[in-house]
Curated annotation (Swiss-Prot):
Domain writeup: The IMP cyclohydrolase activity resides in the N-terminal region.
Sequence ranges assigned to domain MGS-like in this UniProt record: 1-145
Lineage start: Bacteria, Bacillati, Bacillota, Bacilli, Bacillales
Name assigned to this protein: Bifunctional purine biosynthesis protein PurH
Family the UniProt entry places it in: Belongs to the PurH family.
Entry-linked Pfam families: AICARFT_IMPCHas, MGS
Length: 511
């Protein structure tokens, strides 16, 4: 019996060549609507779906393949005598190949002016039903949903006269991944349209960006996936201009650096190691900002990741070239800067839009047996809601330093303390189990520079000991959330030493 293929695609990439190859193998081709028209325009002889179903396409094409003659031909188990007898009795013929991809729902809802009606109209019904039927019966039916698989299928047909069982199984698995992702996009879109923030079930879909050499450590396997609608201002959507492939740790660190540099509107440079900032500088231009970021911690920046929110120019590139760095990420690089930096063959250069995230972004964190979902911490300092409980208010320069430190401290692993002075960080205390421990680390790193600096804490002071350490180091201004039952103790110490202290009312834990 002659084999038959059903072809109905929205992505018409390579379909003419593929169908030509099927016809050359003696396979009869059934097609629908726009696909049939395209194939016939290219001189290929195909059978219309209505000739198989005995029923016209109706309701603007909504109903065309949902018919027993189609699904019987797909689902019949060919070595089951009852199935074969029923097919013969009903005049059905088997379908051996299904080449279908679905209505472009993802592309439709990505359009800024899409209407709800347009989105609904691009929900495919017949397509998923066909490919699921074919995939279920993959022992007898080859189902192709991705043009990338056309060549593999044709090659096996030419060599063996049929598609290998292993290939059929892989194609079937791909179908169910495809339909699962498709349905996830639809369910998430409808959930968002209803304004439902915490649905009873959460279905997420990600697309593979690349396999990684290994994970956090060489013995761990890893892969990088991107969200279908991730913000373009992200590592997932960055363009790599030069250097080795990104590693798992590179991606984590670049993400951290990018998150911090987005906090600034003025020219800024951030240096990151192990997902914590080791140096942050701002300036009148990117060269000055980098100089300050470097001077913030010239030891830790070695082997680090750099993020800048302005184009990297030649002068800055020459300074960057002087030390070993893993990654430089920026909106762009001048031609001269690229010539300088590309002389280091392993240095990864990435370009990406620098846009501050919104609260609509969701952060997913896996835990054993589950998943935590929360809004990204995008809250900025609101000067209209702050309070100053101390006798002295910050000076203009202290305010400047406090704001810089506060922007940075929210991105440091808790317990977090950041010292800033003269448009740069000078000390970072991260990830300690007690707050005063982080303060001591930051103060030690700052050394004499701590005199006259500003301190930011990601959470309140449970004891006045951090303020006492700050006073000993000559720190003159502090910004913290406040809210401890012992706030008065910290205020009293601050007043004793003439320290200005600001309460924000907002905590910025980061774990």
């Amino acid at each position: 019996m002659k084999k038959r293929a059903l072809v109905s695609v929205s992505d018409k990439t390579g379909v003419v060549e593929f169908v030509k190859g099927l016809l050359e193998q003696g396979i009869e081709v059934i097609s629908t609507g726009g696909t049939k028209k395209l194939l016939e325009e290219n001189g290929l002889q195909v059978i219309g779906i209505s000739e198989v179903t005995g029923f016209p396409e109706i309701m603007d094409g909504r109903v065309k393949t949902l018919h027993p003659n189609i699904h019987g031909g797909l689902l019949a188990v060919r070595d089951n005598e009852t199935h074969v007898a029923q097919m013969n009795e009903l005049g059905m013929e088997p379908i051996d190949f299904v080449i279908v991809n679905l209505y472009p729902f993802k592309e439709t809802i990505a359009k800024p002016d899409v209407t709800f009606a347009d989105a609904i109209e691009n929900i495919d019904i017949g397509g998923p039903t066909m490919i699921r039927s074919a995939a279920k019966n993959h022992k007898f039916v080859s189902v192709i949903v991705d043009p990338v698989d056309y060549d593999v299928v044709l090659a096996e047909l030419k060599e063996n006269g049929e598609v290998k069982e292993e290939t059929k199984r892989k194609l079937a698995a791909k179908v169910f991944r495809h339909t699962a992702a498709y349905d996830a996009l639809i369910s998430n879109y409808l959930t968002e349209q209803m304004g439902e923030e915490n649905p009873e079930t959460l279905t997420v879909t990600f697309e593979k960006k690349q396999d990684l050499r290994y994970g956090e450590n060489p013995h761990q396997k890893a892969t990088f996936y991107k969200a279908p609608f991730a913000v373009t201002s992200s590592v997932a959507y960055a363009e790599q201009l030069h250097g080795k492939e990104l590693s798992y740790n590179n991606i984590n660190d670049a993400d951290a650096a990018l998150s911090i540099v987005k906090e600034f509107t003025e020219p800024a440079v951030v240096a990151v190691k192990h997902m914590n900032p080791c140096g942050v500088g701002v300036g009148t231009d990117i060269h000055e900002a980098y100089t300050r970021a470097y001077e913030a911690d010239p030891v830790s920046i070695f082997g680090g990741i750099i993020a800048a929110n302005r184009e990297i120019d030649k002068a800055t590139a020459e300074k960057l070239h002087e030390i070993f760095l893993e990654i430089i990420i920026a909106p762009s690089f001048s031609k001269e800067a690229l010539e300088v930096l590309q002389s280091k063959k392993n240095l990864r250069l990435l370009t990406v839009n620098i846009e501050k995230a919104t609260s609509a972004s969701k952060k997913l964190t896996s835990v054993q047996g589950g998943l935590l979902v929360q809004e990204e911490d995008t809250l900025s300092l609101d000067e209209s809601t702050i309070s100053i409980p101390t006798k002295r208010e910050p000076s203009e320069q202290e305010w400047k330093d406090l704001k810089l430190a506060w922007k940075v401290v929210k991105h440091v692993k808790s317990n977090a303390i950041v010292l800033a002075k003269d448009d740069m960080t000078i000390g970072v205390g991260a990830g300690q189990m007690n707050r005063v421990g982080s303060a001591k680390i930051a103060i030690t790193q700052a050394g004499e520079k701590a005199q006259g600096s500003a301190l930011a804490s990601d959470a309140f002071f449970p004891m006045p000991d951090t303020v006492e350490e700050a006073a000993k180091a000559g720190i003159t201004a502090i910004i913290q959330p406040g809210g401890s039952i012992r706030d008065e103790d910290s205020i009293k110490v601050a007043d004793t030493y003439g320290i200005a202290m600001v309460f924000t009312g907002v905590r910025h834990f980061k774990h």
